[in-house]
Amino acid sequence: MKFFIDTADVHEIREAHTLGLVDGVTTNPSLIAKSGRKFKDVIKEITAIVDGPISAEVIALDAEGMVKEAKDLVKIHKNIVIKLPMTPEGLKATKQLSAKGIKTNVTLIFTPMQALLAAKAGATYVSPFVGRLDDISQDGMGIIEEIRTIFDNYGYTSEIIVASIRNPIHVLNSALIGADICTIPYSVMLQLSKHPLTDAGIKKFLEDWEKVPK
């Protein structure tokens, strides 16, 4: 399984990269806004840190505008992936960009059928949002399992990026289901490495070491 980091915070990306955990990065307008920096400046800096797919989202709502923005964004770096909304216009843009060899990530997916449409349009990646579904008492991980089954049934090559991850259990279940990628907030990445028994074991080893004659 690949791990992407879901942030536009360059410091977090650097820290996660030093751990050897980052295979790619996903950003969105909300994350860019939090950084307080210019969009292209942030994307350029990220591409200098991580040698992997970097998802940059378009703002236009019409297919023509999306394609125009995409052509501008891919000039930044070869690793740029165009993030498009799951709408009819987004599907049109996905089809056009895929035909030109431009990688796409269809986002804001909340049903298996939306993922299927994105795959049929030629999306490189599909991004179902599990946390937001959980928030409204729907089964977020359930749709990941359904998407995996549909893609396997028909041989779709679009990779499943599990997004809106809130906790380590989301990552665990994604791995068990066979999702291709999890895009994970930095805080959750750090949680993956933690367990109270690990901390207790380290403490015990250090205490015992102090008893060893020096």
Curated annotation (Swiss-Prot):
GO cellular component entries: cytoplasm
Entry annotation: catalytic residues: K83 (schiff-base intermediate with substrate)
Enzyme Commission number(s) from the entry: 2.2.1.2
Record PROSITE patterns: TRANSALDOLASE_1, TRANSALDOLASE_2
Compartment(s) where it occurs, according to its Swiss-Prot or TrEMBL record: Cytoplasm
Keyword Mitochondrion among record annotations: no
Catalytic activity: D-sedoheptulose 7-phosphate + D-glyceraldehyde 3-phosphate = D-erythrose 4-phosphate + beta-D-fructose 6-phosphate
Protein name: Probable transaldolase
Role summary: Transaldolase is important for the balance of metabolites in the pentose-phosphate pathway.
InterPro entries xrefs: Aldolase_TIM (IPR013785), TAL/FSA (IPR001585), Transaldolase_3B (IPR022999), Transaldolase_3B/F6P_aldolase (IPR004731), Transaldolase_AS (IPR018225), TSA/FSA_arc/bac (IPR033919)
Family: Belongs to the transaldolase family. Type 3B subfamily.
Keywords for this protein: Cytoplasm, Pentose shunt, Schiff base, Transferase
Pathway linked to the protein: Carbohydrate degradation; pentose phosphate pathway; D-glyceraldehyde 3-phosphate and beta-D-fructose 6-phosphate from D-ribose 5-phosphate and D-xylulose 5-phosphate (non-oxidative stage): step 2/3
GO biological process: carbohydrate metabolic process; pentose-phosphate shunt
GO molecular function: aldehyde-lyase activity; transaldolase activity
One Pfam family matching this protein: TAL_FSA
UniProt lineage: Bacteria, Pseudomonadati, Thermodesulfobacteriota, Desulfuromonadia, Geobacterales
Gene3D superfamilies for this protein: Aldolase class I
Top EC class of this enzyme: transferase
